[in-house]
Amino acid sequence: MSVKLVSVTPDAEKMMAYVARVSNPNNQENPNYAKLLGYCIKHNHWSVFEQSFMTLEIETTRGLAAQILRHRSFTYQEFSQRYADSSMLADTIPMFDLRRQDTKNRQNSIDDIDPFVKQEFEIKIRRHFDEAMVLYQSMLDSGIAKECSRFVLPLATPTRLYMSGSCRSWIHYITLRSANGTQKEHMDIAEACKKIFVEQFPTCAEALEWV
């Protein structure tokens, strides 16, 4: 998993403060905007935060990408397994963490699997991944279309996507997906996004008490 900045609105916070003062044109050029943005966050004036945008590149798995793509206020561009060979992103499919199913919460897992059980299944999973990649490449080598061959690949197959959204969308996404109830791997992505958000929107981050 990795997350990195691709682009952000120049002077993003200054831009949001400028449009927030649309009804006070004599004060629009005021360079002091920390209190203004803090006030807007505190009192849920979220439309202001729809005026600046950020695009991040996210390296993850097909399984987690499906969760991310459910956030429909963003726009996306994802690596196409129909157009390109999946091995362009990775020659092998990386191992993932194994956790026990929480019997009281179907959307939660607990990290207390017996090490010997974990080792047993990791061996089987690695074999399964290797066989899947061999089968996939064999299908491509035999002239079978990528759009057909991709269906034999596991959800753990690496993917890359670009995620673009307003400051408001990023605040909502990070707040939701860094909280309890989110799958650990998705939470790790949200935390990485949060780190970049704090760097690019420091005034907002402070008002949100993220720093």
Task: Name each model-derived stretch.
Residues 1-211:
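Family-specific signature for flavin-dependent thymidylate synthase
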